[in-house]
Design a protein with these regions (language model features):
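Alpha-helical subdomain
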Residues: 1-111
Length: 111
């Protein structure tokens, strides 16, 4: 999930690269602003809006092992918002892994 312009750009890239699109059922590639297949979800949402996110993930099999991948997300939020997001996903999925990438270095203003 991401902001509208980012999701639309990602959908366009996925559709244009067979290396990526071959992993997704073609019937799930009709929209320009989301991809929602059995194994992959990409949609517009504010990650802090947990009720909306929960609604978008309603059909996901919660018992399956789940990977949540984020990039440059938590560093820009208040610690309480980050904690809320992590706890929210942990409560939705009993078997969840969270992979987070932040562009920081030990000697920068974020480190």
């Amino acid at each position: 999930m991401d902001y509208p312009d980012v999701v639309k750009r990602k959908v366009k890239i996925i559709k244009s690269k067979t290396l990526l699109s071959d992993f997704i059922d073609p019937s799930c590639l009709g929209s320009d602003d989301s991809i929602e297949s059995a194994d992959y979800k990409l949609f517009i949402a504010d990650v802090r809006d947990l009720p909306h996110v929960t609604e978008k993930l309603a059909l996901v099999e919660k018992q399956r092992p789940t990977l949540i991948l984020t990039e440059c997300l938590l560093i820009y939020m208040k610690a309480t918002d980050s904690e809320f997001i992590l706890n929210g996903f942990a409560s939705l999925f009993p078997s969840v892994s969270f992979l987070n990438y932040e562009m920081i270095r030990p000697d920068d203003k974020f480190g």
